[in-house]
Regions:
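Hydrophobic beta-strand anchors of alpha/beta hydrolase catalytic cores
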Residues: 60-61, 87, 132
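Structural microenvironment flanking redox-active thiols in thiol-disulfide oxidoreductases
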Residues: 72-107, 116-122
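Short extracytoplasmic/periplasmic juxtamembrane "stem" segments immediately C-terminal to an N-terminal membrane anchor
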Residues: 35-57
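N-terminal targeting signals for export/organelle localization
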Residues: 1-43, 161
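Short, internal strand/loop/helix patches
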Residues: 104-138
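Loop/turn elements at helix/coil->beta-strand transitions in domains of secreted/extracellular proteins
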Residues: 56-58, 83-86, 111
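Thiol-/selenol-based redox modules, centered on thioredoxin-like
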Residues: 135-161
Length: 161
């Protein structure tokens, strides 16, 4: 067991409380757990149109904007998730498909990227980037989060569900 002077425990506790409060605040407008998520067919960045969700398959849906600095740091973690979870990235709030293609190419993303729109953003209640949902095979929200997530954080959130 690590021992820290009392001051450090107070600092760590305060940091944890602030992190938790910010996370809860960022998720306040997102779809609620067990809520039904809409499935949209969207144009793919490098493929034909595809549905966001695959019926019968658990899916991680990661919403990002190509100008988002936090997205730049965290989106690469999607490529390292295991193959047991269908993963799709949905671009929102972009100028054109080339802007998204440049963003994705610079990060060598290996998951399907779909080009979303304001209707998708409204249906999934996206107000901050990045935002992501874990959705079950019947379209119900199992988990949600917003902001930076490390690979360990993504694995923990997707495996615990």
């Amino acid at each position: 067991l690590l021992t820290f002077p009392g001051k450090y425990w107070k600092d760590l506790t305060l940091a944890a409380l602030i992190f938790t409060a910010v996370t809860v605040w960022m998720q306040r407008d997102m779809l609620q757990l067990t809520q039904q998520a809409d499935n949209f067919v969207l144009p793919g960045l490098s493929t034909a149109s595809a549905a966001i969700l695959n019926p019968g398959e658990r899916t991680l849906v990661y919403f990002f904007a190509p100008w988002c600095n936090i997205c730049k740091l965290s989106i690469g973690n999607l490529s390292r998730l295991n193959d047991e979870l269908h993963t799709v990235a949905v671009a929102l709030d972009y100028k054109n498909a080339q802007q998204v293609a440049t963003f994705v190419g610079d990060r060598e993303l290996k998951v399907p990227v779909l080009l979303g729109n304001s209707q998708v953003a409204a249906a999934y209640q996206i107000s901050v980037y990045p935002s992501y949902y874990v959705i079950d095979g019947q379209g119900k929200v199992l988990g949600r989060s917003a902001g930076y997530s490390s690979l360990a954080g993504l694995l923990w959130r997707t495996q615990k569900i």
